[in-house]
Amino acid sequence: ADIEKFVYAKGAGAAKPEDVGHVLYNRGVIDSMIGVEAIRTAQKKFGNKPLTGEQVRWGLENLDLTAERIKELGFEGMLQPLKMSCADHEGARHSRVHQWDGKEWKVISDWYEGDDSILLPLVKETAAAYAKEKNITPRDCSKVE
């Protein structure tokens, strides 16, 4: 993998080389890729310059990772396409089951998609309770471009 060739072979990796490719390592790499792609998205709108936090948030809320882009980035099979918005910071609710076989984690299922009819009411209820407890006024996504 490129990460082994360009990072670990040069002694620049922060994790143990044997952790490369494991589920928790991959989650970190995916999260980093999403952050970079959000910045790229924001720079397409605001210019190729240092961005403000608000501009990066705009990039996250307008991120559209297609299957083609995921493949181009070398992440095919690691995540499903996702499209984020002000109202949906997840972008997708897909997951797979991993199982430890005593030596390594192995994917043992196809992709599952969360049931929004169950999940979204729970998310909204929990978010509203948190906002009330912390005295936070939630953003009105109808006013966001």
Regions found by a protein language model. Give the residues of each.
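Extracellular/periplasmic periplasmic-binding protein-like sensory domains
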Residues: 1-31, 111-118, 125-126, 138
